[in-house]
C-alpha cells in the first residue's frame, strides 16, 4: 500500500505549483531547454526541432496570421504559433540537438543521480536539456532581458511591413515614438513577459520602476484582450498621429459596443496604462542588461540606417593624388596647340574651361563619381576633334606612367 501511494505521488512531485509554464501558463515541471515549462510544451518543442517541422499558421492569409492564442486551453490549436512562442521566450534549439540519449535511458538516469546527488523524482530530473546549470538569479535576468530583446527586434519587422510606402526617416520617427507601447502589447499578448515575472524575478531597475512596469502589465492582463483587439491596438499605437487612427477608433468602438458593452472604458484603460509607463523605466527594467549604457534612440537609428554603398574611390587609390597634375597637363597642351585649326582650338578651349573650374576646387571636395568621370574623359581622345587632329590630347596611358612623369617633373624643378 505504501509503495502504491509513493508511486502515485511521483508525477505530482515534479509539478511546480507556484511556477507557470512560460508557453501555455499551465503548471511547469521544471526547466526544459533553459525555460520553465510543462512536459507537454517541452515535448512538443523537442519533437518539432528534432524532426525539423515547418508549421503553417491556421489563420494564414488573414490579418490575425501568427497571432493565435497559446494557453492551456488553446495550445494544441495552432502548432505554428505554439512553436513561435517557444522560440520567442527563449527555448534553446541547440540543447535539443546536443541531447545525450533518450529520456528513459537507465544509464543516463543513474549518471544524473550520481552527478546531482538527487532522486529521480526531483524537479531537476524533469529538465532533460539543462546541460549547463546557471545560478537562478542570472538565468532569470537573462531570460527576461533576452525575451525583451527578441520581441524588440520582432517589432522592427512588424512595423516595417505596413510602412513600406513611408520614407525611412518617417519610419524611424514613428518607431522611436511608439516602440515601448508596442512592446508592452506584444509581451502581454504572447505572455512572453508577465507582471508576475517582473515583480518576482531578479531583474534590473529600481523597485519604483519595476512596480510601474508591472502595474501596467497587470492592468492589461486583467482585460483579457483577444487577438483581434491586440492587433487593432497595435495599429492604433503605430498610426495614432495620422488620419488612419480615426478609422481604427471607430472599429474599436464597434467591438466594444457589441462585445464588451459592460466595459465602456476597456480600451481607454489599456491605452492609459501604457502611457503611464515612462520609456526610461522600460529600458532600465527590461533592456539594461542587454544594451548596457548604450542609447536606445541611437540603437534604433542604426537599425533603420540604410547600408552604406562602397564608393568608386576605393577602386582608384591614387586618383586623388594625380588629378591636379592631370589637369595641369591639359592646360599646358592646350597652350602649346594655339596654332591648331580653329575648330580644334575651340574644342580645346572649352575643355580647358571645364577643367580649370574643377582645378579651383581641392581634390578632397570632389565627388567620387565626378572623379571617376574626370579620369576617363582625360585619358581618351576627344570625339569632337577634327579628323586632322589624330594624336591623343596627351600620351598618358596609365596611372603608373602618370606617376613616373610626375616624378621626373619634380626632379627638374629641384634642379632649377
From Swiss-Prot:
Biased composition (Acidic residues): 335-346
Cellular component, GO annotation: nucleus
Family matches, as Gene3D superfamilies: Erythroid Transcription Factor GATA-1, subunit A (3.30.50.10), Retinoid X Receptor (1.10.565.10)
Zinc finger (NR C4-type): 21-41, 57-86
InterPro entries: NHR-like_dom_sf, Nuclear_hormone_rcpt_NR2, Znf_hrmn_rcpt, Znf_NHR/GATA
Tissue: Expressed in linker cell.
Location of the region described as Disordered in the Swiss-Prot/TrEMBL record: 331-398
Disruption phenotype: RNAi-mediated knockdown in males prevents migration of the linker cell (LC) during larval development resulting in abnormal gonad migration. At the L3-to-L4 molt stage, the LC fails to reach the P7.p hypodermal cell and fails to perform the turn from the dorsal to the ventral side of the body. During the late L4 stage, the LC turns ventrally but stays farther behind its normal position. In addition, LC polarization, which normally occurs during the L3-L4 stages, is severely delayed and mig-2 polarization to the adherent side of thr LC is impaired.
Protein name: Nuclear hormone receptor family member nhr-67
Organism expressing this protein natively: Caenorhabditis elegans
Lineage, opening ranks: Eukaryota, Metazoa, Ecdysozoa, Nematoda, Chromadorea
Amino acid at each position: 500500500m505504501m509503495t502504491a501511494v509513493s508511486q502515485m505521488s511521483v508525477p505530482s512531485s515534479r509539478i511546480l505549483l507556484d511556477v507557470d509554464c512560460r508557453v501555455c501558463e499551465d503548471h511547469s515541471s521544471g526547466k526544459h531547454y533553459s525555460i520553465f515549462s510543462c512536459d507537454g510544451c517541452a515535448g512538443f518543442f523537442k519533437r518539432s526541432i528534432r524532426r525539423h517541422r515547418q508549421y503553417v499558421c491556421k489563420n494564414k492569409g488573414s490579418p490575425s496570421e501568427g497571432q493565435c492564442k497559446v494557453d492551456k486551453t488553446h495550445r494544441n490549436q495552432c502548432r505554428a504559433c505554439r512553436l513561435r512562442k517557444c522560440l520567442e521566450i527563449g527555448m534553446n534549439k541547440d540543447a535539443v540537438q546536443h541531447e545525450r540519449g533518450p529520456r528513459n535511458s537507465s544509464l543516463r538516469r543513474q549518471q544524473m543521480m550520481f552527478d546531482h546527488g538527487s532522486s529521480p523524482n526531483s524537479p531537476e530530473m524533469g529538465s532533460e536539456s539543462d546541460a549547463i546549470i546557471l545560478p537562478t538569479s542570472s538565468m532569470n535576468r537573462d531570460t527576461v532581458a533576452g525575451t525583451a530583446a527578441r520581441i524588440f527586434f520582432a517589432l522592427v519587422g512588424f512595423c516595417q511591413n505596413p510602412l513600406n510606402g513611408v520614407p525611412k526617416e518617417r519610419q524611424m520617427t514613428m518607431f522611436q515614438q511608439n516602440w515601448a507601447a508596442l512592446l508592452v502589447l506584444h509581451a502581454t499578448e504572447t505572455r512572453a513577459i508577465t507582471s508576475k515575472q517582473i515583480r518576482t524575478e531578479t531583474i534590473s531597475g529600481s523597485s519604483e520602476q519595476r512596480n510601474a512596469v508591472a502595474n501596467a502589465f497587470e492592468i492589461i492582463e486583467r482585460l483579457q484582450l483577444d487577438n483581434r483587439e491586440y492587433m487593432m491596438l497595435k495599429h492604433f499605437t503605430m498610426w495614432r498621429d495620422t488620419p488612419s487612427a480615426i478609422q481604427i477608433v471607430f472599429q474599436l468602438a464597434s467591438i466594444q459596443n457589441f462585445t464588451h458593452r459592460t466595459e465602456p472604458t476597456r480600451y481607454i484603460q489599456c491605452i492609459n496604462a501604457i502611457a503611464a509607463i515612462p520609456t526610461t523605466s522600460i529600458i532600465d527594467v527590461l533592456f539594461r542588461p542587454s544594451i548596457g549604457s548604450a542609447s536606445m534612440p541611437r540603437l534604433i537609428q542604426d537599425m533603420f540606417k540604410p547600408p552604406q554603398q562602397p564608393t568608386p574611390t576605393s577602386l582608384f587609390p591614387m586618383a586623388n593624388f594625380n588629378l591636379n597634375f592631370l589637369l595641369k597637363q591639359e592646360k599646358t597642351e592646350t597652350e602649346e596647340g594655339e596654332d591648331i585649326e580653329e575648330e580644334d582650338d575651340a574644342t580645346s578651349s572649352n575643355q580647358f574651361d571645364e577643367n580649370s573650374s574643377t582645378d579651383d576646387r581641392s581634390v578632397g571636395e570632389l565627388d567620387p563619381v565626378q572623379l571617376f568621370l574626370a579620369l576617363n574623359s582625360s585619358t581618351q581622345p576627344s570625339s569632337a576633334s577634327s579628323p586632322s587632329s589624330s594624336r591623343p590630347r596627351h600620351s598618358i596611358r596609365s596611372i603608373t606612367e602618370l606617376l613616373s612623369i610626375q616624378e621626373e617633373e619634380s626632379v627638374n624643378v629641384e634642379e632649377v
